[in-house]
Amino acid sequence: TSGTQMVKDIRPGYPSSQTYNPYDGLSSDYLYVLGNHVYFAANDGTNGTELWKSDGTASGTMMVKDIYSGGGGLKNFNTMTVLDNNIYFTANDGTHGTELWKSDGTTSGTMMIKDINTNILSSGSNANSFTSNHVMTTTENMVIFSANDGTHGNELWKTDGTAAGTALVMDLTPGSHSSMGYPWSSVISHMTSMGDLAFFYVDSNSAGASSYKAAFVTDGTPEGTFAIANSSSLGYVSSMTGFTAIGDQMYFVVGGGGSNLYVSDGTIN
């Protein structure tokens, strides 16, 4: 294609198929590449927000699958990630609640990986495994993400794309307080991959849980999941942000009485 042009008017008229409202579509920031297609969330005005793909042509721009007929199945589309020949995302099919899905770009190859939270809510609907602020990233051989199985709260999980290979990595905050997900419990954020490792920030500061802020690293195993820098040793910490991998080094900024640059190879001194 030469020049600069709109690929396709997915939802003719107004509102558009892509907006800055996460419940209607997506912002232009949220585009994911798999093979020679770009994947994104869009609403054509009929099917709700679903997974779409485009090869850069109008005829090659299409909905991958209507996951939730009439309801819009795609959820939290700003945390999609790609591993091997599949794109991973969260979706609600109207039966299982919001769960982990994957797609190879075909209708038949778009499927739920595992129903992580099988609990039934008082409303009669299925519980969601994913909150609106869950995180997800890809290492060299797995997807690392946060999820709630209804027992441990929002915690650290991994998947290789199979139900059997989808498992809890570690309960970072044992008991009723989760390590991730809600303002009244701990929160995980800034998840960033480096080779076969994933780095992330945990802020555990809720009623009943001790105040603890730390940068963590994980290789997808319990023994390989630990804090590389924490408020116990650093003193006052207000935040840890800016996780950026360069080669085999992860850089991040620790805030608290000023901001300081840190670097880690994933080990503790």
Language-model features: locations:
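Feature 14080 marks short, conserved micro-sites in well-ordered regions
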Residues: T1-N269
